[in-house]
Amino acid sequence: MALRLVLGRAGSGKTRLCLEEIKAILAEGPAGPALIILTPEQATLQMELDLHRAAGVPGFSRVQVLSFRRLGWRVFQEAGGAARPHLGEMGKAMALRAVVSAHRDDLGLFAPLAGSPGFIEQLAHTIAELKLYRVTPADLDRILERYRETGREQTILARKLRDLALVYRELETYLAGRYLDPDDYLTLLAGRLPEAAFIRGARVWVDGFNGFTPQEEAVLQALMAVAEQVTVTLCLDPTLRHRRLGETELFHPTGETYHRLRQLALAAGVRVEDDVCLAGTPPRFREAPALAHLEAHFGRWPLRPFRGDAAGIRLVAAANRRVEVEAAAREILRLAREENLSWRQMAVLVRDLEPYHDLIVNTFRDFNIPLFIDRRRPVGHHPLVELVRAALEAVLEDWAYDPVFRYLKSDLVPVPREEIDLLENYVLAHGIRGRRWRDSRPWQYGNSRDLETPSPPGSAAGETINAIRERASCHLRRFDGALRGRQLTGREITAALFDLLQELGVPERLAAWSRQAAAAGDLDAAQEHEQIWEGLMDLLEELVLALGDTSLELEEYAAILDTGLESLKLRLIPPALDQVVAGTLDRSRQPELQAAFVLGVGEGVLPARLPEDATFSDREREELRAAGLELAPTGTLRLFHEEFLAYLALTRSRRYLWLSYPLADAEGKALSPSPLVRRLRQLLPGLREETAGTELPGGDDDLVYLTTPRQAAGHLARLLGRGRPLPPLWQEVYRWLHQDARGQKMLGLLEGGGYRNQVDPLEPELARGLYPRPLRLSISQLETFAGCPFRYFLSYGLGLQERRLYQVDPAGMGQFYHAALKLFVEELGRRGLDWGRLSDNEAAAIISQVVDSLAPALQHEILSSSARYGYLRKKLEQTLQRVMEVLNEHARRGEFRPLAVETSFGCRGKLPPLQLDAGPGRRVFLEGRVDRIDVARRQGRPYLRVIDYKSSPTTLDLTAVYYGLALQLPLYLRAALDAAPELLGEAAEPAGMLYFAVRNPLIRQRGPVGKEAAARLRRQELKMRGLLLDDVEVIKLMDREIAASPDLLPLRLNKDGSLRKGAPVAGREEMALLLDLALARAAELAGAILSGRVEISPYRRGQETACDFCPYRPVCAFDPQIPGSGYRRLGNLPGDFWQLAAAFLGSQMKG
């Protein structure tokens, strides 16, 4: 029984000494007492590999490489003592939550925090620390008693200790005799070690530790008392072992460990052998003088500069983290290719992995560098975790849209994603949730947008949706049925969840994913899919152990399980032997490195700016220490120990050290280098600091960019994008890519350098198949094409439509208004009422009746689905009431009366279509729906006007008509005039075309306004706007009071009865010219459609563009900055509109 301490600075050969000793013992004979190597858990695999190489034998059974926990498993297996169920960290957190919930009324300071996010985790962390340092509830009581004696029982610290003692004691009572707390594992191990026969006479080497917790120290003390010899290696300058080191000294952590171990051995009556001191220049740096100097003088003051060349050390300042990682990846590739280093001989080290993880993974994948990230893998993103969370949330939130489709899109529900997408569109369009999911009756909703004649349910599409719904929801419905409306225990809820996972075939699906990932070479993903099921089952088992017989509300169960899922992490092992390992300074263990890449050497990162503990402040820790309660080091001491971590990082490799730091973060905020950088410059004056920027290649150092074909092609594409001649080197790269099979796959990137965002016209055959003859078009489709041909192609050629949602959008409101105004006119006809004699009260009553009849048909009773939509219903009715007051005034003051409302013209309409001649063999039927066609007679001759309802004030823009962007009103009037013989039995004259805004305008006035004045102001705001026939008498048929009250139409009369200058009117010939122009422009646009034009060519008029509110921007990716992809600019007309219109028609006639 003896303790031996092996001391040496970094690289002095401590691990090598242990392995050589084991090799020598094995050479004497394979049989004998156990040889045990005790290492940190994350280092066991590496140690086994190093042992295999050092021993030089194919295998051995006498040597065991163990961590503390694995040692415990071996001891308990032989000596017993751990028969109770092992409660893991997650199970303990669940038990702690139950304890806190049961004793919440007894808590003081912690009571208001008990339900806060993260509180249970922090409390579990604190109790774990207490156990780690062998502090019992009785120890806390002892400190509290001192506080009471000194009248300090109401201090914050005393109140914390009181609550901690209460929770700690109750947790111990809860677990006692039932479960084994993971934080008691090492304490129990220390007690059982003497009873383990394989330890007696064993030789133990403890390597890779810089310090031990009191629990680990107790295990080591027990080992010393049983084993033949315990050898502990410490990274400590042997010359410093005879004195206690100050907290700021470099080797303070290991110096304290050295003295503690000697005290433990003496206390146990164990002989302490002479220290093995490994002095002199560490063997690791014999071929690297600069690294040797750095190791020897890093922690010494005053600094001694190195007079030689700083060969093997590079210091790089990078523009940002992405550039930093790319520069490191290029150097790793160079070392592998030119220096013949294997991947495993290089490692990437960071103090904080979080900001670098994704950058390292993505960059190394792009550079084809095999990589293993050394960390416990969080799995909150995994589909299985998402499935479990979503299933519970779906039941809790009564089948709300979000959790239901998160569940379905986990890819663990046996329904194809295409069918889930169809189901999702249907659910969103019809607002389905809650009992409508759980109801066994089929869904029956029409899909028509026509409020008056909705499409019948029960169609083939409806049957398909119901079949998908059944397959998608049947398992979740059974799960819901097992949980809803019942008081259940944790065991019963867990059983229902397990049944759901089994019914879905989750284990089989995960196994298949694992096989697929392995076949594709993604061994990390294969391990993840393989381990996640086991991890979840362990978590559920712990939950049942901790809370199986406890009655839980489902919400509480879900919160507890979610806490466990958040902390669930997988322990992946490197899937291959030859990989670059990336990890944190305090975790990674790679002793035989040839090159170390230390990234992120920034201020506040290395040394790290450590957060203060949430339970005990540094001042409180010092106070407890003075009272005899030893806990984890204070933040100040941990900050001093960061220096030691930095020392280990800088001395990890034999030949090559890369240090880098970013100058800015991802948002461009400036970052500063670590103070270590300044010290490095002082220690190594010959070290030249390099920069890695974001500039494009094209200079003297371009060879560094030729790392992989993919990377070279990417840089080449950026150079081509400059539009300048390529430098000679890159011309060679371009030629190589064209000639090499691998390089040809990268040509798509090269073409990006000369990218032009344009689409070729459709082939004639394809255009004929896409647009059947004769082509039927609506006027809005023509206007869309005039705005941008590609938008027309996507919307009407390919049929891409925005997803319909269960909401009242502007289109739905417009639909409602149109239907209400139509029904109003029809109700007048049914009752035989003259609109001109109708009072506002009578009109309001009819409108109210119309709204009552239409409201249920809008989006499947959406207006009665919530209080918010109930309020919207009132606003819709109020708007219609205001609008009707103005329309009533029109009827009272004019002779025009509705002849037809919401009347369709087209092949299947009430009126015949407009026929267009779009070229030889290209007949086009133009279809549409006119909101209102009004008629009045003068001297026995009928006059027609058309009215188009809009949601906002709109005027007839003749320039927009000329360009084909506003054809509706002229073509509506043309369709009405063409249909006049059918409607009236005789031809009719055009009276005008008008827009009417259906809205409830907000009138701003400084003072109070009377009822009549307010009505007049509303009429002025709701004036009809458009183009009227230049005939005062016809205009008076619309408003006989226009001379006195010009508040209905967009014009005024002079005192002599003539029209004022600038009035929007046109003579009969001009009106006919306008209608002919609109028809000719429509024919031209229709011809372009049939010709297959689909170019991305949005118009721009002033600040208005076709891209405004266009839903297809993500599809076309239009960017006016790309050469050749600018807007099609439409300016003001270069002359008189009527002359230009006549000229256009003349050119069309000649063509």
Curated annotation (Swiss-Prot):
Cofactor info, note text: Binds 1 [4Fe-4S] cluster.
SUPFAM superfamilies: P-loop containing nucleoside triphosphate hydrolases
Positions of [4Fe-4S] cluster binding: C788, C1107, C1110, C1116
Domain UvrD-like helicase C-terminal: 282-578
Pfam families membership: ADDB_N, PDDEXK_1
UvrD-like helicase ATP-binding domain: residues covered: 1-273
GO biological process: double-strand break repair via homologous recombination
Cofactor requirement: Mg(2+); [4Fe-4S] cluster
Major enzyme class: hydrolase
This protein's record includes keyword Nucleotide-binding: yes
Known EC number: 3.1.-.-
Residues bound to ATP: G8, R9, A10, G11, S12, G13, K14, T15
Summary of subunit composition and partner proteins: Heterodimer of AddA and AddB.
Family affiliation: Belongs to the helicase family. AddB/RexB type 1 subfamily.
Alphabetical list of PANTHER family matching this protein: RECBCD ENZYME SUBUNIT RECC
Function: The heterodimer acts as both an ATP-dependent DNA helicase and an ATP-dependent, dual-direction single-stranded exonuclease. Recognizes the chi site generating a DNA molecule suitable for the initiation of homologous recombination. The AddB subunit has 5' -> 3' nuclease activity but not helicase activity.
Protein name as catalogued: ATP-dependent helicase/deoxyribonuclease subunit B
Species: Moorella thermoacetica (strain ATCC 39073 / JCM 9320)
